[in-house]
Amino acid sequence: MSMKILVLNCGSSSIKYALYNMDDKSVMTSGGAERVGLDGSFVKVKLANGEKKQIMHDIPEHTEGVKFIFSLLTDPEIGVIKSLDEIDAVGHRMVHGGEKFNKSVILTDEVLKAFEECSDLAPLHNPANLKGVNAVKELMPGLPQVGVFDTAFHQTMPPKAYMYAIPYELYEKYGIRRYGFHGTSHRYVSARACEFLGIKAEGTKMVTCHVGNGGSIAAVVDGKCIDTSMGLTPLEGLMMGTRAGDIDGGAITFIEKKLGLDADGMSNLLNKKSGVAGLTGGSSDMRDLESAAKSGDERAKLAQDMYFYRIKKYIGAYAAAMGGLDVVVFTAGVGENQISMRSEVCKDMEFLGIKFDESKNNVRGEEAIISADDSKVKVVVIPTDEELMIATDTMNLL
């Protein structure tokens, strides 16, 4: 019997899933419940043959969502397995593991207690991740479950990279430091880029750019992360769809006073109303931004310039931090698909050893080398596959 692993990613109002056949690492079926706990909840299902279905279903909370997803997996019409007993284990995306987790682990009661203690670091995500784990526990007691942490890959950062220059007791008392996110993606693409280029991770200095609606960059030396752009929360670093990224702390207190905002109001402004959407007063989607900029919208053009510039700056900074640069990787929704972003970011970077080839850059969502043949630094596009990484980690821990 082939091993089958179910991957779950529970957000505050969504549950994404994928069922893997680990013999050939293929996706048997995948989908997601959306609007969990809200009116008009539904589940999207993608079958192995590529056919898509949308099913309206009332999902008041996560346990009901997981239960319904289980019923779809064994459904006589659209299911892909005869019985839930065919599932060997469940792998979960866990957002914030704090300093407690530097690798994927089997989710024992002890582990879950430690994870719960990290909840104030990710008050939206961690409780939702836990709900997914508890739902599986309730529905299929005894089924092995594995946690794969977004923060784990970045736990190799040295203190000089992760500490903030604030009173030290804030770190000791509350764990305030840089943690970084998208770690599973950075880990996957950094390893995959080496395979794709036929090089060893040892001795390679790489910058991985995970650019989606949320974005982060990591400096990876010898296959290990030494710095990353997101911080205590996913708000620091790059300019994003709705997040501000790097901003002067003094500007934050200034805005709070001017607008009479409390901490929650300020957090909402920086996380939900800033970034591309905040600057343009419109969409946070880079495709909309690109067409608006092309049609002469000044503010869209400014937002786009700022967005590209911030990525370019981080690549330069991390090349300095690593003392060199061998590979730049672009991944995630924008990184894999936006040709103009890659082109602008890599422009005028010859001094760093990046020689770009526009003719090779015309790719979307596929693995490709987009630097010139004689470029000292290789620039590649590697589509990320966090779910496969989670499934693989889960299999390896059984």
In which residue ranges do the predicted regions lie?
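Phosphate/pyrophosphate-binding loops at sites that engage ATP/ADP/AMP, CoA/4′-phosphopantetheine
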Residues: 72-87, 193-200, 315-326
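Catalytic phosphate/nucleotide-handling subdomain of diverse soluble enzymes
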Residues: 221, 227-262, 268, 332-363
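Adenine-nucleotide phosphate-binding core of ATP-dependent small-molecule kinases
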Residues: 268, 275-279, 286-321
